[in-house]
Regions:
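Conserved G1/Walker A P-loop phosphate-binding module
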Residues: 1-42
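Conserved catalytic network of the ASCE P-loop NTPase/AAA+ motor domain
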Residues: 3, 47-50, 61-69, 90-95, ...
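Switch I (G2) and immediately adjacent beta-strands of P-loop GTPase domains
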Residues: 36-84
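Conserved Switch II/interswitch segment of TRAFAC-class P-loop GTPases
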Residues: 79-82, 95-116, 125-127, 138-143
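Short acidic active-site motifs
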Residues: 84-88, 178
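Conserved beta-strand/loop subsegment of P-loop NTPase cores
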Residues: 98-101, 124-139, 157-170
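Charged helix-capping and loop-helix junction motifs
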Residues: 113-119, 147-151
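Canonical P-loop GTPase G-domain recognition
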Residues: 141-198
């Protein structure tokens, strides 16, 4: 008997050049992740995401000590960070089961981080989509402190929320640091919602 199928859509959201496509490429090329297709990336002539990056990934999911087995297919997609393409971002977010907000550690990008985060909250608050925050580019010499970043986004200066979920994930996506953990955790939150809404 074949295992039942679960399908999720995970969207990477954030300001332009914060590292969404870099996260996507790291996961797409990860040796322990099975791809169902080669992926699609629509870019401008200068290499920036015009529409979206998208790929389908497959996982075998075991729950309750191998009693319940599922096939998990995850559509991993990025929303362009360019502000002139706002309407495409809302379209890409439709049907999402979880979102990774990718922020830039450069202090000069804080206004763009705030604008993009507010925009995301406007969409996710009505849809009740779980999200996590990845603070990327932690290797920058002038990287903003975690507390300054949290204050700027008006999020609590605590490590975890009431359910024990991490508030901000540090990452250096260009070398893969923190990328897999963010992905695993947003898939976990999305699956929790999936099973509790059945």
């Amino acid at each position: 008997m074949s295992s039942p199928l679960i399908q999720l859509k995970i969207v990477y959201w954030g300001p332009g050049e914060s590292g969404k496509t870099t996260n996507w490429k790291v996961l797409k090329n990860h040796p322990r992740i099975s791809r169902l297709n080669f992926g699609m990336s629509v870019e401008t002539t200068d290499g920036r995401t015009l529409w979206q990056d998208s790929i389908f990934l497959r996982f075998d999911l075991n729950i309750k000590a191998d009693i319940d087995r599922y096939i998990l297919v995850t559509q991993l997609t990025t929303a362009t960070g360019q502000e002139r393409f706002l309407s495409t971002r809302e379209y890409i977010l439709s049907g999402a089961d979880g979102v990774v907000f990718v922020a830039d550690s450069d202090p000069e990008m804080m206004e763009q981080n705030k604008r993009s985060f507010r925009e995301l909250l406007n969409f996710t608050n009505t849809l009740k989509i779980p999200y996590i925050i990845q603070l990327n580019k932690r290797d920058l010499d002038n990287a903003i402190s975690i507390n300054q970043f949290k204050n700027g986004l008006e999020i609590p200066e605590i490590e975890q929320d009431d359910q024990g979920n991490q508030i901000v994930y540090e990452a250096i996506a260009i070398n893969g640091k923190g990328v897999l953990k963010c992905f695993r955790d947003i898939v976990g939150l999305s699956l929790y919602d999936f099973f509790n809404q059945k």
